[in-house]
């Protein structure tokens, strides 16, 4: 794989962006954007450097946090009347909360045509940059491949009781299972899973690292690119895709009160463009754009179901969260 600096240089000759000259000029007059993002530090840095190399007249100021801290920060700033972001890159479920509160403006990038329709907001408030397919990870020293769970029902076997970990805030997975299986089956399953003495923690990366280190044999709902990355580095970890594979949407949007809207649109265009999506591919992630396959061929075989953001928008993420916490005994 090309190193990121070489990849960046190579990409700039490949694409004409959807922003026309007048749009670029308007963005350069604004001179900067404030980006709120959940993308990991190194990946975020490379993306920003690539954008600023293409558009040296626009400076990106970035704040990074988890999806939970993103939700808290944006809503806290909203209450104080001082939302500072020009661009928000976060989970689709959290973005639905922002949309419902009137915090986003419509922007349909010309690049969005290349993103599958069911991975875009039908009203044009946000667009998926890349999905995060959730898989089950296991420590290869503690679990033989033939013994690893192959189905959701396998997670209920007595042999895994007290030996699995899961993120505390899997509300979108919980909501999507209800859409795919039906509410009755999904609730019944989660109640059975709750009897398996699951160790709940905060952060998918943290849990993946714990599995790789042998601190816990199995991690449920891990991000596939993170497991593949650890495996590539020699960690004692592998993964299995349990059907249905739920994909968390990592989406981009512009706040309704963005101080630098033209520069924000330019950044959105860039992340959705061929160049931006090839960077996503270079990070080992799944590009959201049609025609650009993941580097990892096994990951490319996954056919994920996008998070049920429509129902989350209608019902409310907090409603799913409350029921999820009650089932799993979380505070």
Regions found by a protein language model. Give the residues of each.
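Extracellular/periplasmic bilobal clamshell ligand-binding domains
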Residues: 294-331
